[in-house]
Amino acid sequence: MSFLFYGDSKHLRKRESFHFATIEKSDYSKQLQSLPLLPSSSSLRQDHIFSNVAKEVNQISDDVAIIYSRLQEEIDTEQSQTKEVNNKINHSVKKLESSFSKLVKLRSKFTKDSDKQLKQFESKYSDIDKKVRIIRDVNEELLDYVTRNGSIKVDATQFSKISKLLQERFPESSNTTETEANKDNSGQSQNEANSESLNSSYSRQSTNGSQNNAKKDYHSTKGNSADSNTTKSYRQSISSAPLALSSIRSTSRPSIATTLEHICITEPFTRPRGMSKSADL
């Protein structure tokens, strides 16, 4: 029992005691106390966790199934509508192709007809152009004849419209020709009276004829001088306003005269007795 009284390590009474600082009221103890309690091991098992979340998992699976069914319905509807639209488009394409083929056929037909009509028109136009050129040539020859001999040389009874047209186009020449015609009529009446009173002898008739020829030459020279003054107006009016024979109508079928040989133009007044046609020209 000696070890109880001595401070020997071998003796229990002789051992030293140690004193530790407590942390009961420190911040560390407060933080340890604020920690949550550890769950029990039964609550951490897999079957317990699955039983707690089974309702949510089932609800999610149901929602996914509903969404999938709705999407499938929409897809089916879109497919049916797309199929219907494709059928209508194919039908429209077939109709369009048939219409296009008909249009191509009609176009080829109309093109052939138009080409044929164009050729006919060109041939008719060439014929009309030739006839117009012939008529212009005849008009130019007629105007040359009128400007050389005057409008008095056109027979008013046979060519009333031509003489009227010439009087409208050339009033000055028509006035001069009227005065000349009056003078010719007065000379003609005098010649007829002289011829009736002097029918006794052939020599006196010949002398009267020569006098009448002299008077006619005098009037013709006077008319030619008047015509020479109006020749310029004739030529100027020809270029600006050519003679148009479209207003002249004939009851029979018209014939085209290429030269003046086929045109019968006579003098509008009676010729004095005993005068030849060569004396007038």
Curated annotation (Swiss-Prot):
Statement: the UniProt record of this protein carries the keyword Transmembrane: no
Q: For this UniProt record, give its keywords in alphabetical order, as a comma-separated list.
A: Coiled coil, Cytoplasm, Cytoplasmic vesicle, Transport, Vacuole
**Compartments where found:** Cytoplasmic vesicle; Vacuole; Cytoplasm
Compositional bias of kind Polar residues: 172-213, 221-235
Can you list the GO cellular component terms from the UniProt entry? cytoplasmic vesicle; vacuole
> Where is the stretch described as Disordered?
170-235
Q: What is its main location?
A: cytoplasm
Note the coiled coil stretches, chain numbering. Answer: 67-92
Relate the assembly described in the record.
Answer: Component of the biogenesis of lysosome-related organelles complex-1 (BLOC-1) composed of at least BLI1, BLS1, CNL1, KXD1, SNN1 and VAB2.
As for what it does, the entry says: Component of the biogenesis of lysosome-related organelles complex-1 (BLOC-1) involved in endosomal cargo sorting.
Q: Which family does it belong to?
A: Belongs to the VAB2 family.
Name of this protein: Biogenesis of lysosome-related organelles complex 1 subunit VAB2
Q: Which organism is it from?
A: Kluyveromyces lactis (strain ATCC 8585 / CBS 2359 / DSM 70799 / NBRC 1267 / NRRL Y-1140 / WM37) (Yeast)
